[in-house]
């Protein structure tokens, strides 16, 4: 399945003027544009017949938000949908790679329980049902409990930084997977010169989110 991809565009001074006159108007304009893209993605997913959507993007790109918005759009269009975070499959601090400072490296693929992901994805693609692990970030350990999931004939949206890694997308038949890359597409310029790029924006978003 093809990945949904939107080319970047440079935002010129006209949009700055909108922001200066009414920040609320700019926010609404941005929300409307985003909503149209989400609705478009939902239509493409429904048309693909895939049971599993693999959604990824860089840090602070809006992966989790987009996954839940996509699920809502799918439900509105008549397709049941549920969201699964790849963080659910973390093995735990005792079994995962560490950063140089000793903290858990959540962005390392080896942090995830790949055999269990394979099992769950295959069960979802074949039966629409599986049992998901529950990860406790406070204790950095996997809970003994599990979470049953039933797609009810719908779609599972798997979101995470490794969602498009071939190690994961190759676990189930290609016709059962739809791939989506979520990322910021607007960069801001003055006189054709880029002054705020998507990396700057993501850094600001992550700072606001995690500070």
Give each language-model segment a name.
Residues 63:
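Conserved lysine of the Walker
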Residues 53-55:
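Hydrophobic anchor at the beta1->P-loop junction of P-loop NTPases
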């Amino acid at each position: 399945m093809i990945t949904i991809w939107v080319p970047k565009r440079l935002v010129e001074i006209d949009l700055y003027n909108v922001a200066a006159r009414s920040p609320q108007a700019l926010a609404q304009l941005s929300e409307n544009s985003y909503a149209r893209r989400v609705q478009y993605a939902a239509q493409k997913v429904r048309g693909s017949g895939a049971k599993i959507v693999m959604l990824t993007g860089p840090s602070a790109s809006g992966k989790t938000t987009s996954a839940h918005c996509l699920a809502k759009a799918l439900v509105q269009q008549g397709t049941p949908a549920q969201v699964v975070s790849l963080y659910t499959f973390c093995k735990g601090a005792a079994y995962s790679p560490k950063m140089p400072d000793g903290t858990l490296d959540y962005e390392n693929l080896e942090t995830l329980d790949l055999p269990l992901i394979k099992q769950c994805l295959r069960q979802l693609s074949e039966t629409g049902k599986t049992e998901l692990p529950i990860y406790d970030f406070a204790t950095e350990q996997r809970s003994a409990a599990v979470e049953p999931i039933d797609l009810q004939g719908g779609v599972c949206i798997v979101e995470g930084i490794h969602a498009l890694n071939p190690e994961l997308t190759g676990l189930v038949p290609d016709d059962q997977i739809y791939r989506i890359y979520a990322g910021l597409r607007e960069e801001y310029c003055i006189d054709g010169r880029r002054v705020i790029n998507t990396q700057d924006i993501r850094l600001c978003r992550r700072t606001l989110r995690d500070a």
